[in-house]
Amino acid sequence: MGWISGFRLRLAANALRNGRIVAYPTEAVYGLGCDPFNEDAVRKLLALKRRSQIKGLILIAADVEAVESLVDLARVPLGAEVRAGWPGPTTWLIPPRPGIPDWLRGAHDSLAVRVTAHPVAAALCRVFGGAIVSTSANLSGHRPARTPVRLWRQFPRRAIHFLPGRLGGAVRPTAIFDAMSGRRIR
């Protein structure tokens, strides 16, 4: 997956803490992320992508413990399956813990979460100190960016802090499942 310096990771984590949007490599495409608990940052990210808040957002984390601060896996019928598939390219829809902001869930009763297996994305979450928003780097309705060139064609450089790195080997975006029913959503 390539090596990334601690300095670059700290710069990106500080950008997140300061309400900026960060572009970073994920399993299949470049992602755009921000601090999920900074409402202004989330709104800025949605506006940049021209994405409706109703859709909700995915949060990624470096480990299960970070996800458990957001959702209660013990109450989920498929909790063992969820844990067994992480880290990995599967996102699960899980009822959130009390106090999780509405702007993350959109019009849904669940929160989309994943423990990423991508080394750069996971390292960014670790250095940041928790989960981050992870949405594909593209304008709504356009193809996700798989190269920095495509990223910069869609977004102004001044709007995004870029964390370089190679994409993972996945060809499609991660699968999404409902952890209560097991139903595949995407």
Swiss-Prot record:
Belongs to the SUA5 family. TsaC subfamily. GO terms for biological process: regulation of translational fidelity; tRNA threonylcarbamoyladenosine modification. Gene3D superfamilies: DHBP synthase. It is an enzyme of class 2 (transferase). Its EC number is 2.7.7.87. It comes from Methylococcus capsulatus (strain ATCC 33009 / NCIMB 11132 / Bath). This is Threonylcarbamoyl-AMP synthase. Required for the formation of a threonylcarbamoyl group on adenosine at position 37 (t(6)A37) in tRNAs that read codons beginning with adenine. Catalyzes the conversion of L-threonine, HCO(3)(-)/CO(2) and ATP to give threonylcarbamoyl-AMP (TC-AMP) as the acyladenylate intermediate, with the release of diphosphate. Keywords: ATP-binding, Cytoplasm, Nucleotide-binding, Nucleotidyltransferase, Transferase, tRNA processing. One of its GO terms (molecular function) is double-stranded RNA binding.
